[in-house]
Curated annotation (Swiss-Prot):
One of its GO terms (molecular function) is magnesium ion binding. GO terms for biological process: 'de novo' AMP biosynthetic process; IMP metabolic process. Plays an important role in the de novo pathway of purine nucleotide biosynthesis. Catalyzes the first committed step in the biosynthesis of AMP from IMP. Binds 1 Mg(2+) ion per subunit. Gene3D superfamilies: Adenylosuccinate Synthetase, subunit A, domain 1, Adenylosuccinate Synthetase, subunit A, domain 2, Adenylosuccinate Synthetase, subunit A, domain 3. Homodimer. The lineage of its organism: Bacteria, Bacillati, Bacillota, Clostridia, Halanaerobiales. It catalyses: IMP + L-aspartate + GTP = N(6)-(1,2-dicarboxyethyl)-AMP + GDP + phosphate + 2 H(+). This is Adenylosuccinate synthetase. It comes from Halothermothrix orenii (strain H 168 / OCM 544 / DSM 9562). It is found in: Cytoplasm. The active site is at D13, H41. The gene is purA.
Length: 428
């Protein structure tokens, strides 16, 4: 297998949880490298559904080591809640490790996130309100607290006091709300710290040892390429790097140790929150995709905006991630449509644009140029061999491969882990 990375190629919600669960089963170590509990993976094992937001999906297999890397911003309350949920389901947590240098989401981060969205009004970004952005802001501004800072009570108090001097100034003077009390925060977080303490370690060293022992490592991505702070539809993005480059900075593993980068692409396109979406379908087809695909956020429950597959977006993801293969998910959701459209470029004024534009104002003014393919009526959820797919479904897959020059090696035909087609990497 080698060491693999799974990344989302779109605006998140591509079905990475299922693909991760499929591939992580052959790994020895499963690692989260960025984001926070704003992400959500749904994994179905033996008919039981697990919704994970922070903990790697390898936790469902007791023989695997699971790592939350330094690039993740950790909300102790959310993490402990997730740990308790897994314990209640009989899942062991002895194989879970948390980076000592991961930054911590504090109560003021969540409050500031919501207050800032409210202040922006119509100009809001559409965050999950979980404090992710403010936590990353403090990390870059060098005033954040890391997991290791919470382990010693005196150190925690001193660093929290310094942080609150700034945060309370912001809360009182800018947002006109009551300041936060240091004793209340200390008391609340003390409980979480004791639960997390046995799991905290230098995860970069742990991963280095795994590499030296020739263990297979699987890096589990969160969100998607178009939510990347550098390569996404800025400013309608997250505050981290969900792209493959985030693996190295978010785990302490060098790029030479990454063998494959698998891009997960949904057979149609979805988006949660604000921002331009050229292929969005505000019609019956969009509603059908949403209902049939159960397109509601795992983390927020918000209905997702739905549209046709966008090739310029996928080409962009191939380039910035260095994708070596694709996993196409939810092909079954397209069954029953009379025709299926694929955006191959954009019309902007009198110009034809075939690459994804970095200028969001241009993207907002783009009209999609479609290639129209005939649909298929067959129920494909039971198909396990590529050759058994309807001809028009195979034409759809081939069009994607021909346009982005990357092979589709996994095709999801249903929500279950086993409802998928596996193909060899070399595709004619």
């Amino acid at each position: 297998m080698g060491n693999k990375v799974v990344v989302g190629t779109q605006w998140g919600d591509e079905g990475k949880g299922k693909i991760t669960d499929m591939l992580a089963r052959t790994a020895d170590v499963v690692v989260r490298y960025g984001g926070g509990n704003n992400a959500g993976h749904t994994v179905i094992v033996d008919g039981k559904k697990f919704e994970l937001h922070l903990i790697p999906s390898g936790i469902l297999y007791p023989e695997k080591v699971n790592v939350i890397g330094n690039g993740v911003v950790v909300d102790p309350e959310a993490l402990v809640e997730e740990m308790n949920m897994l314990k209640e389901e009989g899942i062991s947590l002895n194989n879970l490790y948390v980076s000592e240098t991961a930054h911590v989401i504090m109560p003021y981060h969540r409050l500031l996130d919501k207050l800032e969205e409210k202040r922006k009004g119509d100009g809001k970004i559409g965050t999950t309100g979980r404090g992710i952005g403010p936590a990353y802001t403090d990390k870059v501004a060098r005033r954040g607290l890391r997991v290791i800072d919470l382990l010693d009570e005196d150190t925690f108090y001193e660093k929290l006091k310094l942080a609150l001097d700034y945060q309370n100034l912001l809360l009182e003077k800018v947002y006109q709300v009551e300041p936060m009390d240091i004793k209340e925060i200390m008391a609340q977080y003390k409980e979480y710290i004791e639960v997390l303490r046995p799991h905290v370690t230098n995860t970069s060293l742990l991963l280095d040892e795994a590499i030296k022992e020739d263990k297979k490592i699987f890096f589990e991505g969160a969100q998607g390429t178009l939510l990347d702070i550098d390569y996404g539809t800025y400013p309608y993005v997250t505050s981290s790097n969900p792209t493959a480059g985030g693996v190295c900075t978010g785990t302490g593993v060098g790029p030479v140790w990454i063998d494959d980068v698998i891009g997960v692409v949904k057979a149609y396109l979805t988006r949660v929150g604000e921002g331009p979406f050229p292929t969005e379908l505000n019609n019956d087809i969009g509603d059908k995709l949403r209902d049939k695909g159960h397109e509601y956020g795992v983390t927020t429950g918000r209905p997702r905006r739905c549209g046709w597959l966008d090739i310029p977006i996928l080409k962009h993801a191939v380039r910035v991630n260095g994708l070596t293969e694709l996993a196409l998910t939810k092909l079954d959701v397209l069954s029953g449509l009379r025709e299926v459209k694929v955006c191959t470029g954009y019309r902007y004024g009198d110009r034809l644009i075939e690459e994804f534009p970095g200028n969001i104002d241009i993207l907002s003014g783009c009209e999609p140029v479609y290639e129209v393919l005939p649909g298929w009526d067959d129920d494909i959820t039971g198909v396990r061999e590529y050759g058994d797919l309807p001809e028009n479904a195979r034409r759809y897959v081939k069009l994607i491969e021909d346009m982005v020059k990357v092979p589709v090696t996994i095709i999801g035909v249903g929500p279950g882990r086993k409802e998928a087609i596996r193909r060899e990497k070399e595709v004619n």
